[in-house]
């Protein structure tokens, strides 16, 4: 009840049309759209398609004068079917792991089998009065039947702003829906309509009507067709199964029989036969208004002349002819097969807008609206229509925003990558571990799980000698240094670690930083400046790209490990101050850089080399000195960077090189100068880990054997997994949602791995890199 008006609005909701008198449902004066007519709703309810829960909304004045009518239904909707990047095979796989993935119950206002304005009104001026009442009733119904989302669908552009003004304060957000195709009929015959087209466009339409002469196909025009209902359902299912366009209804023989029964004199079926056998149909409907509606179609794709006959085009032309003969002013052609429909004279694509709201969570509301905008495919359009659509897309995106354009946090409101994973129930980041990381680890709520995703390659994070060294340093020095290394933050422990690292790598000097990421930022931003050129492998770690941007230098890429491409880049940049920046081992792929060729090219072209050995130190080379040492070119690397958070079981990083270079970084590397020093416990743990790793070389052999064992076993099972002689085994899956779902499924099954997607993984690949501390029997 709307009590804010002198004449209250009374709202009633019925669960079946059988409880409603047809005369009380239909609005007077031709205001009821065809699709919302009583008899047009009957086939959907009577056939039981899609297991819908039906609700029929009636808003009247207290004296019984009708104000508005709306068709509501509650339906389970698989949002994953709208994701164009998720193939049916991947979707099936995820559903097997997580049966409820992206499946929600929607309470929708609109029509299931056609596109039409969702709300019929006595007068357009009643919208502001009726729509809030409708939204309130939907809210209550959603609460009662457990619907996750509310959706008011298929709003016309001309009504959009008024709907927005009413629904946005109620928590709804807009999204572009599936676009429909209409043509305005202004001709007295099909021949006149074809005369509006060029010869090139007219000829295919005209010849499509020659199916009898060219292929021996006959067509029946039927007003009663219940006896053909099983055939119609079978032919329709062929279209649903094969169509690339999204279809959500699931029609059965009862639906077609009910259409014949309830829509006699207001529907027509064209049944195409070849040698007496039904091969295709087109079913159209019309009401008292000016619209002629193409409702459903089906075809046998195994029919021998299927492609050449183009019966869909022929049926469109027969429909246009019938619409003209009935003096209809508009032919509504639905939401699929845009390319063919746009060949019809006067055809235009019309955007439709959905208004969405989660029943309880505003974040889910925003996420769904963004996902719908992103996932629903837009048709390829002529330039004039395309420009209009682009304007609508931008307008809807702006109206989706919960924050104004000038607010810097608007980008936060616009993202839906991680909130989408949460909505789908496959978000697994930030798992909580409750114990030390060995070959297994205790996870909160999961218990003991196998650990196949860790940077502790040598398993030294729990080694007694390393743990005791860390504890002793804390007892001796305290928990932190409370200052920059440049000032009060340098301990004798730091100095001795720098000396040991320099000696370990055969370099004159080394300098510490608080993290590996900081080490790259500090070194590269100090060494490079505007006018310099940084040349990077396309698959370098994110920190190296961030460091290049921070430096202000120009930078360019060469294809991953493509030395011919690198040589061309060096020739093209001859005469500039240059440095090649490269990962020794690529953390997402497990591949090893061709450092020998890089060193040779750098010497030939007078270029410096900066190598990040983070994932190689401790694992590759003599005594674990890294890939450069393994390839015999460590002395030719101008700057060597490494981190302590991998093999050395701690945290922090360092840069090693000639003393003048290192001293320059000490005084100019912001990440070193303006950060607190490495905690004493971390420095001492690194000291101890270095000692243990050199004393126990079998640890390196074991981790590489485990990686090879893992890669071989996965490849044998058909996975794209390769062993590159490092501790990292990537499994490439090709889709981010699958990678995240697989990761969560494995974790809940007792195995931890790392899911990786851009920007962590470049090139659009998605996968699970296994970083192995485990022995083969555990694997």
Where are these regions (language model features)?
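PLP-dependent enzyme catalytic core of the Aspartate aminotransferase-like
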Residues: 468, 472, 476, 503, ...
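A conserved beta-strand-loop-helix scaffold within acyl/acetyltransferase catalytic domains
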Residues: 6-89, 139, 149-307
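Acyl-donor binding region in acyl/amide transferases
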Residues: 53-55, 60-61, 67, 73-174, ...
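Active-site PLP attachment segment
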Residues: 623, 629-664
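Conserved PLP-binding catalytic core of the aspartate aminotransferase-like
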Residues: 702-708, 716-750, 764-765, 772-774
């Amino acid at each position: 009840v709307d009590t804010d008006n002198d004449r209250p609005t009374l709202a009633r909701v019925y669960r079946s049309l059988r409880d409603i008198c047809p005369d009380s449902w239909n609005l007077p004066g031709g205001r009821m759209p065809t699709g919302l007519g009583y008899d047009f709703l009957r086939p959907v309810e009577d056939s039981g398609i899609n297991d819908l829960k039906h609700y029929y909304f009636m808003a009247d004045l207290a004296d019984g004068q009708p104000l508005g009518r709306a068709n509501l239904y509650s339906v389970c909707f698989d949002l994953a079917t709208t994701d164009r990047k998720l193939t049916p095979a991947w979707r099936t796989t995820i559903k097997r792991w997580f049966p409820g993935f992206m499946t929600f119950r929607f309470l929708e206002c609109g029509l299931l089998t056609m596109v039409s304005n969702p709300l019929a009104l006595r007068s357009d001026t009643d919208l502001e009065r009726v729509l809030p009442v409708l939204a309130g009733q939907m809210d209550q119904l959603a609460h009662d039947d457990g619907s996750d989302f509310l959706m008011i669908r298929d709003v016309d552009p001309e009504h959009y702003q008024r709907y927005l003004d009413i629904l946005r304060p109620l928590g709804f957000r807009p999204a572009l829906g599936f676009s429909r195709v209409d043509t305005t009929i202004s001709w007295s015959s099909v021949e006149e309509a074809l005369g509006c087209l060029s010869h090139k466009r007219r000829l295919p339409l005209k010849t499509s009507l020659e199916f009898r002469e060219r292929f021996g196909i006959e067509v029946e025009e039927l007003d009663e067709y219940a006896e053909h209902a099983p055939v119609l359902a079978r032919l329709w299912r062929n279209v649903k199964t094969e169509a690339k366009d999204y279809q959500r209804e699931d029609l059965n023989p009862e639906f077609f029989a009910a259409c014949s029964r309830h829509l006699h004199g207001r529907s027509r079926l064209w049944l195409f036969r070849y040698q007496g056998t039904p091969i295709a149909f087109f079913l159209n409907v019309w009401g008292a208004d000016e619209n002629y509606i193409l409702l459903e179609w089906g075809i046998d794709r195994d029919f021998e002349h299927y492609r050449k006959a183009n019966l869909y085009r022929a049926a469109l032309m027969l429909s246009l002819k019938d619409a003209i003969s009935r003096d209809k002013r508009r032919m509504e052609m639905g939401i699929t097969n845009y390319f063919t429909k746009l060949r019809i004279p006067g055809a235009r694509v019309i955007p439709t807008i959905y208004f969405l709201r989660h029943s309880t969570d505003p974040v889910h509301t925003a996420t769904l609206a963004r996902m719908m905008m992103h996932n629903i495919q837009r048709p390829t359009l002529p330039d004039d229509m395309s420009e209009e659509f682009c304007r609508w897309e931008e307008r809807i995106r702006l109206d989706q925003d919960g924050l104004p354009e000038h607010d810097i946090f608007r980008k936060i409101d616009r993202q839906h990558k991680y909130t989408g994973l949460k909505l789908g129930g496959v978000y697994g980041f930030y798992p909580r571990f409750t114990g030390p990381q060995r070959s297994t680890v205790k996870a909160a709520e999961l218990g003991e799980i196998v650990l196949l995703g860790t940077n502790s390659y040598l398993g030294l994070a729990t080694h007694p000698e390393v743990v005791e060294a860390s504890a002793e340093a804390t007892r001796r020095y305290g928990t932190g240094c409370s200052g920059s290394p440049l000032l009060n933050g340098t301990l004798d422990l730091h100095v001795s670690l720098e000396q040991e690292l320099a000696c370990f790598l055969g370099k004159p000097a080394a300098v510490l930083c608080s993290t590996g990421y900081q080490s790259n930022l500090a070194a590269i931003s100090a060494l490079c400046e505007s006018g310099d050129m940084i040349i990077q492998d396309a698959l370098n770690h994110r920190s190296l790209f961030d460091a290049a941007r921070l430096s202000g230098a120009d930078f360019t890429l060469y294809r991953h490990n493509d030395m011919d491409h690198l040589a061309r880049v060096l020739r093209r940049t001859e005469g500039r101050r240059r440095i090649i920046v490269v990962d020794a081992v690529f953390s997402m792929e497990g591949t090893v850089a061709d450092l020998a060729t890089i060193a040779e090219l750098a010497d030939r072209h007078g270029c410096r080399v900066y190598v990040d050995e983070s994932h190689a130190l401790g694992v590759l080379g003599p005594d674990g000195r890294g890939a450069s040492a393994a390839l015999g070119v460590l002395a030719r690397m101008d700057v060597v960077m490494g981190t302590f958070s991998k093999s050395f079981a701690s945290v922090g990083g360092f840069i090693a090189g000639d003393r003048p270079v290192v001293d320059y970084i000490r005084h100019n590397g912001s990440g070193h100068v303006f950060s607190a020093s490495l905690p004493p416990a971390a420095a001492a743990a690194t000291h101890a880990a270095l000692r243990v790793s050199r004393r126990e070389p079998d640890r390196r052999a074991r981790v590489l054997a485990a990686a090879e064992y893992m890669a071989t076993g996965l490849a044998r099972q058909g996975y794209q997994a390769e062993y590159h002689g490092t501790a990292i085994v990537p499994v490439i899956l090709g889709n981010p949602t699958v990678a995240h779902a697989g990761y969560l499924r494995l974790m809940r099954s007792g195995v931890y791995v790392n899911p990786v997607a851009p920007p962590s993984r470049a090139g659009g690949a998605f996968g699970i890199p296994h970083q192995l501390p485990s022995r083969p029997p555990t694997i």
